[in-house]
């Protein structure tokens, strides 16, 4: 039996698009929210809009440009992407998931929605502290207390690695769609991406692992 409704924090990337198709299997009504936070590539927002339109879903786009004004990182500034082993990479945007989920919760409450879906993942979390399960659970409690509302933050990818995320997309009948239409690349190239940035490396490594495992099955 499907739950009634869900709001997805949606970027148009591999993870959030996989969550979209997951939600379509589990909810009667699905809405999307995308945040314009001064990201390098406004194409991300256009990709999210296009996917929402193709799927016939209500899509909210919220201005969060203030975030880009108060943080310096490789996603909102024209600086080189760096990822030193054992350190948080400079693609990390301080407060991003905290703020996105908080504003998504405000919107969800106004829409009468309880479930908020986000594609964060601890297995392949790239060193981002706000992708951890402990953070999401803590924020869920905080939001419920702050707004006297019984939100449920759903994280269907939390314990999946990238290969398993590809497998889930395939199980949902969305493998080709995710592979061809999503934007994960930090350099703004849809689909297979640039092949050089950390996001592309993670995505491609997961894809190759999944296809190898699928071939052996």
Swiss-Prot record:
Its cofactor is Zn(2+). The keyword Protease does not apply. Binds 1 zinc ion per subunit. GO terms for biological process: queuosine biosynthetic process. Zn(2+) binds at residues 185, 194, 197, 200. Signal peptide: none annotated. ATP binds at residues 10-20. The keyword Cytoplasm does not apply. Pathway: Purine metabolism; 7-cyano-7-deazaguanine biosynthesis. GO terms for molecular function: ATP binding; ligase activity, forming carbon-nitrogen bonds; zinc ion binding. Pfam families: QueC. SUPFAM superfamilies: Adenine nucleotide alpha hydrolases-like. It catalyses: 7-carboxy-7-deazaguanine + NH4(+) + ATP = 7-cyano-7-deazaguanine + ADP + phosphate + H2O + H(+). Keywords: ATP-binding, Ligase, Metal-binding, Nucleotide-binding, Queuosine biosynthesis, Zinc. Its EC number is 6.3.4.20. Belongs to the QueC family. Catalyzes the ATP-dependent conversion of 7-carboxy-7-deazaguanine (CDG) to 7-cyano-7-deazaguanine (preQ(0)). Homodimer. This is 7-cyano-7-deazaguanine synthase. It comes from Streptococcus thermophilus (strain ATCC BAA-491 / LMD-9). The lineage of its organism: Bacteria, Bacillati, Bacillota, Bacilli, Lactobacillales.
